[in-house]
């Protein structure tokens, strides 16, 4: 099997081990195909190499249904890391907590949005007034305003188009920040930066596991996480987008 090797000399402890645990956990779901882990050590990981082809509508439709199956495999709790892994997980190069919580809102606000806000402010990418708006949105989320009866889903956690590879055998996922969360968060991240045949993906997902009414209105709520991550290190345009998403979240109630 041909392999793709990633190395990072300054990788924090557990950086690649967390990725490997996430890949294996997602693969166990039997939904979307995930790149297989071949080898892993403290400063490197080797995964199967995926020969990419042009995205196709048939593959997109299959991806939507398979993603629903992956989410349905579930997790022990909101915020739960893959079994066998303890400690922080990583999104890109940034660490984020993975502490199990009973409710989605308490987890999402405290572990997926709030940790990145002061970093964004210090970087000059988010104003103090903008941080106040985000803080109010997080308070609303933490109080349970958007909690529902959805069980914890098995999330990829960094589901943007760059981590969705199109092969001759269908979509293959790489580079997860896997954890237990709300399934709408994966879908919102997929929409944030665009993905080929997104509407077809969403359609077959919804057919396989119908989404709750109003899910499109909640996209900004579920984009708070990736926008906060990007505001922390990718410029003030993401800070402005984060504030806009926070304002839309506040307007939901």
Give the ranges of each region predicted by the language model:
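Short strand-connecting beta-turns/loops that link adjacent beta-strands
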Residues: 42, 167-170, 224
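ATP-binding pocket architecture of kinase catalytic cores
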Residues: 2-106
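Hydrophobic alpha-helical segments that form the core
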Residues: 220-228
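A general structural signal marking secondary-structure boundaries and capping sites
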Residues: 27-30, 71-78, 120, 145, ...
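Conserved Rossmann-like nucleotide-binding pocket used by diverse enzymes
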Residues: 5, 155, 220
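Regulatory N- and C-terminal appendages and interdomain linkers associated
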Residues: 11-17, 42-45, 79, 128, ...
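Active-site Asp-x-Gly
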Residues: 97-109, 118, 148-154, 161-217, ...
